[in-house]
Amino acid sequence: MIYRSKAPLRIGLAGGGTDVSPYSDLYGGAILNATISLYANATIEPNDEKKIIFEAIDRNERQEFDWNNELPIDGTLDLLKGVYNRIQKDYDLKGQGFRLSTFTDAPAGSGLGTSSTLVVAIIGAFTEMLRLPLGEYDMAHYAYDIERKDLNLAGGKQDQYAATFGGVNFMEFYADDKVIVNPLRVKQQHLFELENNLVLYYTATTRESAGIIQKQSKNVTDNKEKSIEAMHQLKQQALRMKEALLKGKLNEIGEILDYGFKQKRQMAEGISNPLMEDIYETAKKAGATGGKISGAGGGGFMIFYCPGNAKYTVMQRLEKFGGYSRNYQFVEHGLKTWTI
C-alpha cells in the first residue's frame, strides 16, 4: 500500500501577522486568506527492512536511518523528522520501516505557508496510514504544536488552519491557542473576478521568516506603540476585506491591500526592502491599485490587485526584476489523503 496526501498553499489577503503570539494572545488576531492550486505533497511507502528513508524531491535532499524511536533534529529535513518523532511518540509505529517522500509546488521561504502546509501534508499521510481520527482543528493544532514546541520554529497559526480547512476563510486567533475558522460564502462570480485580477508574482528571492517574526513578537513584548498600532490596523483591514468580498465590493480591494502594505512595514524591520518597494511602485504605475507582500515579508511572493485588464501590463513591467508571475486558481478543499 502507498499512502498519499496533498494540502494547498495559501494567499494571505489581509491581517497577516496578527496571528502571531504575543499579539494574538493580548489583543486577538484576525486574518483573511484563501487556498490556491499549489500544493505540498507527501507519500509514505512502507518497507520490510526497518529502514526509515526521508526524501525531499524538490530540494534534492535525502537521509536514511536504521529504525529509531527518535531521529536527530540537525538542520536537514527537520520538518519530516519532527513529524515522525511526534507521531512515533504519540501513536507508536511498532518498528514499521518506510520511505517518506515530499514535494512542494513553491520554494521554502516564499511566503505562501510552504513549511506549515508541508507539515500538515506529512501528518495527513501518517493519519491515512494509521487511520487516525483527527479532524481539521485537531490536525492544524497538531501541526502547529510540532512546529512551535517540538522544532522551536517561530511563526503564526494561519497556515496550518488554511491547509486543513481550505477555501476562503476569516480566521480569529485568541489566547491559549484558541482559533476560530469562519468559512466565507463568497459568490462564485466575485471569486472568479478576484482570481482574474490578482497577480501572484515571485520575486525570485526567499527569506527565513523566523527572524522577521521574532522581531515582530519582540516589538509587542517591548510595547512598541508604532508596531502594535500597525497590527491593530491590519486586523481592521481583515474585517474590511471580509466585507468587500462578501458584498462584492471588489473595487475596494486594491485600496485595502495598499493600506495594509503601508501598515505592515511598521511591524518590524526586514518586512520590506528596496527591491520589494521598487517592484511595488512599478506595479502601481502599471495599473495595480494595491498589493502586499505574502507571508512574513523580506522576499518570496507578492500579490497585486489589477482591475480591468491591467494585470497584463503589470506582469510585463515586472519582468525586468527577474522574477515571474505564477498561474493559480482558488481551491475550496483543504488537506486530502488517499491510499493506493
Tell where the protein language model's regions lie, with residue ranges.
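Glycine-rich active-site/cofactor-binding loop and its immediate structural neighborhood
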Residues: 299
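C-terminal nucleotide
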Residues: 1-12, 19-20, 25, 31-33, ...
